């Protein structure tokens, strides 16, 4: 019996019309011959929040522990996870340093929790450089950001957090 986790590829991208502005995320999950596409958006948000939401939504879709390779063109996302910044910010009460709060603590909290449930390898890809799945996720994200009646990114809009 093979107890090794299922290997899943997750491709992500975020988009924002203005920063802040209306934003969207696009996510593609691939497992064997199965493909799932997810997208959504918010009426007022930031590009970094949409990059993070794309990863969060992809990981939230998984129902069992998986070995995930997550592709993103967001250095912010990759560096904060792979260089341990997000864990450090959390340990410091969501402070980057003595004078500066970490941005997007609500989403980092979710992402760190999801990463603890899976084996996640974050891989940076250059955006708009012909990477097929990244380009597709970009189209999903842009399309989502252009929808009418987008919901509120309540934490961003109502709590006035820095992003």
Swiss-Prot record:
Chain ranges passing through the membrane: none
Protein name stated in the entry: Ribonuclease H
EC number: 3.1.26.4
Taxonomic classification: Bacteria, Bacillati, Cyanobacteriota, Cyanophyceae, Oscillatoriophycideae
Gene name of the encoded protein: rnhA
Major site of localization recorded for this protein: cytoplasm
HAMAP family named in the record: RNase_H
Similarity section: Belongs to the RNase H family.
SUPFAM superfamilies: Ribonuclease H-like
Annotated residues for binding of Mg(2+) 2: 13, 138
Function, in words: Endonuclease that specifically degrades the RNA of RNA-DNA hybrids.
Residues bound to Mg(2+) 1: 13, 51, 73
One Pfam assignment: RNase_H
RNase H type-1 domain: residues covered: 4-146
